[in-house]
């Protein structure tokens, strides 16, 4: 079935996008972002007024996906409007006209994992490059970090909590850093926009320097032996056995890890939030986390999680909402597995 990506240039299409966000974010995922309007059954916020909104339509004209792009030069006060994202850090190097922020990437379930995502990024990336954008900022839940890293995005700062969304990982893409796009085997390299402008500003080198402290491991971007060396021992050292790995030899375990990525976390990062609809499975590779839960108006510490410990398994296996907070106590590295792992 053929798809097309359109720029939403009428109030009707923009309102259809707001409604699609509500269907996916509230009705499907069970989230409750502050911008949700439950009477109109749509999600619209202050960034939409000046944003480029992209719509993916099937051959019948039905809306199946969307993405939003904001140029910081179009925002009245980007530092305030995009708080708590680290906008001030970017503005120290880049003029507002060279920075974009992409958000509200959503696809209906039937269209995930197919051509729709690639078409959205192709159009958005091309428009951004043509407009003079040098870096794009986004934020992703842990289970989507792997996807963005394969596109060429890099982690560059600690994770953060967003109201109504939960723990998010800010990520940056240097649009003209062809060396990193090539190293990431990014599909963006196939697009003409990636070849039109040289990185004469040295954005790739700057990105590499600030991203080094937050570099994790993505099984698709490193040699298999390097990835296994980082995660294999921890999978067998913890007191809590991972049922999905029970009885498997090393070769079989490696096959099952083909959706894994390793995330570096800082103290006080809230990896899992009580009541949040998340479906990732986490394995502690390094460091310590603490499990907290609200009970009768009091906050109780339930457990400490150390190397080899597993958390998030109930959400991973289908429970709709997380039953407790999991907060990093020390610097950590955690292996994240998504449901594609199954």
Give the predicted meaning of each segment.
Residues 76-175:
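Acyl-donor binding region in acyl/amide transferases
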Residues 268, 279-292, 307-308:
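Glycine- and acidic-residue-biased ligand/ion/polar-headgroup-sensing regions
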Residues 301-342:
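Cyclic-nucleotide recognition modules
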Residues 261-276, 305-307:
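Conserved short histidine dyad/triad with adjacent acidic residue
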Residues 1-43, 48, 53-60, 232-244:
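Short amphipathic alpha-helix that is part of the acyltransferase structural core
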Residues 55, 61-71, 315:
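Conserved beta-strand in the GNAT
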Residues 62-64, 283, 310:
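Glycine-rich acetyl-CoA-binding "A-motif" of GNAT/NAT acetyltransferases
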Residues 13, 208-267, 316:
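Cyclic nucleotide-binding regulatory module and flanking cytosolic helices
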């Amino acid at each position: 079935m053929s798809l097309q990506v359109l720029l939403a240039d009428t109030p009707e299409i923009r309102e259809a996008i707001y409604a699609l966000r509500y269907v996916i974010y509230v009705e499907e995922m069970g989230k409750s972002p502050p911008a949700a309007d439950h009477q109109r059954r749509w999600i619209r916020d202050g960034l939409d007024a000046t944003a480029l909104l992209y719509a993916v339509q099937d051959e019948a004209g039905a809306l199946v996906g969307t993405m939003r792009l904001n140029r910081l030069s179009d925002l009245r006060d980007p530092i305030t409007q995009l708080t708590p994202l680290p906008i001030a850090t970017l503005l120290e190097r880049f003029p507002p006209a060279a920075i974009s922020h992409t958000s509200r990437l959503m696809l209906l379930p039937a269209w995930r994992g197919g051509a729709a995502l690639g078409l959205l990024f192709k159009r958005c990336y091309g428009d951004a490059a043509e407009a003079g954008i040098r870096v794009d900022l986004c934020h992703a839940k842990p289970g989507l970090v792997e996807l963005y890293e394969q596109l060429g995005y890099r982690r560059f700062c600690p994770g953060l909590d967003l109201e109504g969304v939960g723990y998010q990982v800010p990520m940056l893409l240097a649009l003209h850093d062809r060396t990193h796009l090539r190293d990431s085997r990014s599909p963006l390299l196939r697009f003409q926009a990636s070849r039109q402008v040289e990185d004469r500003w040295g954005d790739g080198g700057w990105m590499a320097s600030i991203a080094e402290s937050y570099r994790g491991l993505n099984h698709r971007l490193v040699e298999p032996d390097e990835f296994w060396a980082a995660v294999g021992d921890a999978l067998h050292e913890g007191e809590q056995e991972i049922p999905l790995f029970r009885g498997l030899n090393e070769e079989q375990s490696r096959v099952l890890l083909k959706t894994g990525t390793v995330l570096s976390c800082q103290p006080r990062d809230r990896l899992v939030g009580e009541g949040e609809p998340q479906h990732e499975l986490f394995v502690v590779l390094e460091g310590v986390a603490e499990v907290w839960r609200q009970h009768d108006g009091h906050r109780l510490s339930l457990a400490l999680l150390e190397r080899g410990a597993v958390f998030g398994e109930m959400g991973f296996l289908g429970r709709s909402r997380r039953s407790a907070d999991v907060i990093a106590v020390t610097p950590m590295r955690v292996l994240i597995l998504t449901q594609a792992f199954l």
